[in-house]
């Protein structure tokens, strides 16, 4: 019996020590809501000795508790630099509430030893404030299981668009994720999307004038649009990031959860990538993850590896492609006879979709804006039309180039530099034609 007691005592001591070692409380505070509200948190924090660029020292992780219950995890991707993480604490009733923030050693990088909290500001958003409904229906995301502990494919930013139809309002939520381990190859991402982050539509939530949910549809695995039938936490729908290309499931959980505070945007005249430009740190995290994962090379290759992201020219465009037309761009440098293309001569790398979008052109290392001479846009045709029907359709193929909204290189911090003075009015390009634009 004494031996058993000694064993149990040893086990209890081991568990206690492990619990103390795996979590450390960094901050505890109270806050009071005078009415039901959505609680917001501005967490300004840093983790000395960590960097998203460095394997083994990628980031520290903080775990946040509300009223004693685990609410979310925060991966401090900004590393040793103080950064304000804008988060949601969810729905709170009127009354006093508690906030606790722990250093989660288990989910932190091996070389992460502590977290410094400079500020943890709680604000409350009640029903009288215009953005309440958009915030109250923001989805909460459980991490994709195979990313936990890998510091890869991390949700960075959530945004929403608002569409009003009579008495109904639809909030469309989209998440920007640091990378995409599955899906489109990296070289194709840069040509077709102008980025290596993953920007994924999550869910549309339609509400009536009282804020009651009328309908919710989301992006399921294989990009299937599905009706949401899962759980909600108050009005927040819960999703698991399910597939390697970051599509979602409305059932299932994982040990890590992210509850990002969304920013409202109007994309009626902008690309989705423009949201990244408004939050330029997302470009930095994108570049650091690519470098750490060995996806950057000086070699001219296709597939998973690309050049330093600062060697690309980023071109933001408004254009409509009709009847199988494809759009691509090329650039000429001063004192250089070559033209550098966005599609790398590959049909799949050309852009067939219409609207506002982004592409990139890979340039030689060390190119600066003053070395750029001319930009051209080219309209091509899908496939090899042979039948009478195919030829008839192809004959009407054209690209309606409406605007070039911005053209830039990334600076030394991997953030967008000044926009180059390249503008064009509406230009109609039948297939097989191109237009040249001087800088």
State each model region's role:
Residues 9-18:
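Bacterial N-terminal signal peptides
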Residues 19-23:
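Boundary at the C-terminal end of the N-terminal hydrophobic targeting segment
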Residues 24-26, 44-124, 337-371, 382-387:
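Beta-strand-rich ligand-recognition modules
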Residues 33-42, 94, 168, 306-313:
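Extended extracellular/luminal ectodomain segments enriched in beta-structured repeat modules
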Residues 43-48, 102-106, 172-187:
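Generic short beta-strand segments
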Residues 118-182:
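N-terminal "first-domain core" detector
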Residues 135, 163-170, 176-187, 191-201, ...:
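Domain-length functional cores that host ligand/cofactor binding and catalytic or interaction surfaces
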């Amino acid at each position: 019996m004494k031996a058993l007691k000694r064993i149990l005592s040893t086990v209890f001591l081991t568990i206690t020590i492990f619990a103390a070692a795996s979590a450390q409380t960094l901050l505890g505070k109270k806050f009071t809501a005078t009415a039901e509200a959505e609680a917001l948190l501005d967490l300004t924090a840093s983790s000395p000795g960590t960097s998203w660029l460095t394997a083994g020292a990628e980031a520290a992780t903080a775990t946040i508790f509300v009223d004693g219950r685990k609410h979310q995890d925060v991966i401090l991707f900004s590393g040793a630099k103080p950064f304000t993480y804008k988060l949601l604490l969810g729905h709170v009733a009127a009354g006093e509430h508690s906030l606790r923030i722990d250093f989660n050693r288990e989910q932190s990088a091996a070389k992460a030893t502590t977290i410094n909290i400079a500020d943890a500001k709680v604000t409350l958003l009640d029903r009288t404030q215009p953005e309440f409904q958009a915030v109250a229906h923001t989805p909460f995301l459980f991490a994709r299981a195979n990313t936990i502990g890998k510091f890869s494919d991390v949700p960075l930013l959530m945004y929403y668009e608002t569409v009003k139809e009579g008495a109904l309002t639809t909030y469309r939520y989209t998440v920007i994720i640091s990378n995409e381990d599955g899906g489109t190859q990296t070289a194709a991402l840069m040509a077709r999307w102008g980025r290596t982050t993953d920007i994924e539509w999550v869910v549309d939530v339609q509400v009536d004038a009282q804020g009651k949910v009328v309908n919710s549809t989301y992006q399921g695995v294989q990009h299937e649009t599905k009706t949401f039938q899962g759980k909600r936490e108050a009005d927040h729908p819960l999703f698991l990031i399910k597939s390697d290309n970051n599509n979602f499931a409305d059932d299932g959980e994982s040990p890590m959860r992210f509850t990002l505070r969304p920013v409202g945007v109007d994309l009626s005249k902008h690309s989705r990538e423009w949201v990244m430009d408004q939050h330029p740190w997302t470009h930095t995290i994108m570049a650091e993850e690519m470098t750490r994962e060995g996806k950057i090379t000086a070699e001219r290759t296709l597939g998973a590896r690309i050049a330093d992201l600062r060697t690309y020219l980023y071109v933001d465009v408004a254009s409509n492609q009709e009847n199988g037309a494809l759009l691509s761009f090329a650039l000429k440098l001063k004192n250089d006879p070559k033209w550098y293309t966005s599609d790398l001569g590959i049909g799949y790398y050309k852009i067939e979709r219409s609207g506002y979008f982004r592409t990139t052109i890979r340039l030689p290392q060390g190119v600066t804006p003053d070395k750029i001479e001319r930009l051209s846009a080219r309209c091509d045709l899908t496939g090899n039309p042979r039948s009478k029907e195919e030829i008839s359709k192809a004959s009407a193929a054209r690209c309606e180039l409406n605007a070039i909204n911005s053209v830039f290189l990334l600076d030394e911090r991997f953030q967008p530099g000044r926009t180059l003075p390249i503008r064009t009015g509406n230009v109609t390009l039948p297939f097989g034609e191109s237009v040249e634009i001087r800088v």
